[in-house]
């Protein structure tokens, strides 16, 4: 079980990323466009740097939906590898079967 503070901090980051996503995309388009003048590009870069650090999507950590474990996360299920194994053995994941060959 992850610390509650870490889980809450990650949820706050998710909200911040969603709030700033549109403006970040606009600024990144201005910065990466070759037709943008140098002064406009510099202004866009400056504004992007002034945005909160946690508004960047790379700072969000995928966590287990049940207990918040940060490692061994499987995107398909939104769970950690251990939780997937546990639920699959119990038959609580629809369509998941133990492989045998």
From Swiss-Prot:
The keyword Ubl conjugation does not apply. One of its GO terms (biological process) is translation. The keyword RNA-binding applies. It comes from the Bacteria. It holds the Pfam family Ribosomal_S14. NCBIfam families: PRK08881.1. Binds 16S rRNA, required for the assembly of 30S particles and may also be responsible for determining the conformation of the 16S rRNA at the A site. This is Small ribosomal subunit protein uS14A. The lineage of its organism: Bacteria, Bacillati, Actinomycetota, Actinomycetes, Mycobacteriales.
């Amino acid at each position: 079980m992850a610390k509650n503070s870490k889980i809450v901090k990650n949820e706050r980051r998710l909200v911040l990323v969603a709030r700033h996503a549109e403006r970040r995309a606009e600024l990144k388009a201005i910065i990466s466009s070759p037709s943008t003048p140098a002064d406009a590009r510099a202004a866009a870069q400056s504004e992007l740097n002034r945005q909160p650090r946690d508004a960047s999507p790379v700072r969000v950590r995928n966590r287990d939906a049940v207990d918040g474990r940060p490692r061994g996360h499987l995107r398909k299920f939104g769970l950690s590898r251990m939780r997937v194994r546990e639920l699959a053995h119990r038959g609580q994941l629809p369509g998941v079967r133990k492989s045998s060959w």
